[in-house]
Amino acid sequence: MLYTPRFIYSNLTAGQFVGGEETKAGLAGAADISLFYEQDFDARGLNNSTLRAGLCISNMGNKMSYSSGTLRRDFLPTNLKLGLGYEMDFDGYNKLTVNGEINKLLVPTNPIYATDSMGRIIYNEAGDPVIESGRNPDVSVPMGMIQSFYDAPGGFREEMREIIWSLGAEYSYRNLFFVRLGYFHESQYKGNRQFLSVGAGIKYSVFGIDVSYLVATKQYHPLANTLRFTLNFDFVSANKNEIKQQGRLR
């Protein structure tokens, strides 16, 4: 289990006036909670196999505002992530790992407000907008996290659309050469990010380089044809090598 606190300072507006009101930097305190489980076990036809599972709730914190003159405060993008992976070691040289992951924002979904014949929002006697479908999003942070599982105006179907899921597979040879394939899916009604990714990687000693290419499944997608390069340095392996060298010198 891992607990990670953080302090957030966000100065997006740099003191500009919006709607006649001066903006300010947003401040918030937040934290992440992570759980990880790993279990090795024997499987027929395999040298070894490993099952991994993880859970992370990130950005749990107080609401943030960019204006001192308004009572409106916005939720941080609190997110729930669940992951499951299975690694198959065939002979000590060839490995195949399959992973799955789902993500869901733990913030209230905006309701549908009642409107009149002119399309104007209807307000009740207290001055609050009348909600036609969904639930009131003006709740506390803990209540907002709980409410996010059942407050969508479209009911259960819309709640399912709010879940982002992804799948991935990696083949490795002697932990030196890697080939990867993945798919990311977000509902067309909740952002419409959908793409395939292919990649490869090479590791030499404590250094590694990875390259990936995004193939969008929709035309005119902003992420289409994105090429990424990543350079890695393994500090743990570097320390182990240094300890071994010191032992030999002695």
Question: Model-found features: residue ranges?
Answer:
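Outer-membrane beta-barrel porins/channels
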Residues: 1-250
